[in-house]
Structures are given as C-alpha cells and as structure tokens.
Amino acid sequence: MGQQTLIYSFVARGTVILAEYTEYTGNFSSIASQCLRKLPASNNRFTYNCDDHTFNFLVDNGFTYCVVATESASRQLPIAFLERIKDDFSKRYSGGKATTATPKSLSKDFGPKLKEQMKYCVDHPEEIGKFSKVKAQVSEVKGVMMQNIEKVLDRGEKIELLVDKTENLRSQV
C-alpha cells in the first residue's frame, strides 16, 4: 500500500466484527474493539485519537464501519473510506448474510474489498477530496432546505390561525 495511512479496517454488527483487514501488526485491532464496545448505537460518526492514530467509526443501521489511520492522514480520507465501504457492504449484504454472520466469517469474502478500498483511497486523494467537498455541499443544501421547510410549516400554521381568527370575527359581526 506504499505509505502507511490507512492501517486497519473492519465492519461489525453491534459488537461482533464480521470482516476485517490489515497489512500491519500492532495493538490497533484490540484498541478498535474496545472503542467499538463503548460506541453509542445511534447512527453517527465518531473519531478517537490514540498513539498517533485516529480510530474512525461510522455507525449506520446497526452496523459499524471502522478504519484506523495515522494522525497525519487528512480528516477527509478516513471519512470517505468509511462511506465507500458502508455503501459497498450495504449493497453486497443488505438483508442477507450480514444479519446472521458469525464473528469474522465475512473476512475472507469482504476483507479483499476492504483492502481494495483502502488502497484506492490512499492512491486517489484528489478524488477523495472532491468527493468530500461535494458531500459537504450536499449536507449544507440539505440543512438549508430543512430550515426552509420548517419556515414554510410555521407560516402555514400562522395562516391557519389568521383564517380561524377571521372566521371568529365574521361570526361575531
């Protein structure tokens, strides 16, 4: 893989690691497992720093995607990697094997995919940067749209109140 940027990754259901991949030796797998047990079950992203490494987690619909990266790696790289393996894993196993798989039973099948995605993300940082920018822009637009929808709903409620008050005034006349 050339430079040691993305070191270890896994996919878990709850606290059960279903597939993992690394080319390196170290205690990062045990630290990542400890972090996994402490993660909230809610859909979210989490990053922990330990011994010059970041332990990056993406929790989504009962599955946890993890990658350990060197602290020198850009913040976008691990996040983009997690999104890519989440999409890949979901397409490959949605509603199937993953819900009943035993510990590490998918490593033989999905481990090479983790390796491939790690290599791709490290070898194509410019594309990953573009992907992250577009994703950030989409999130920003989504936030603005949600605010606009809330304002429209508030206005709708205010209009209903005005209509009710007008009806009350008419009935009093």
Predicted features along the sequence, with ranges:
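Soluble N-terminal interaction domains of secretory/endomembrane membrane proteins
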Residues: 1-154, 160-164, 171
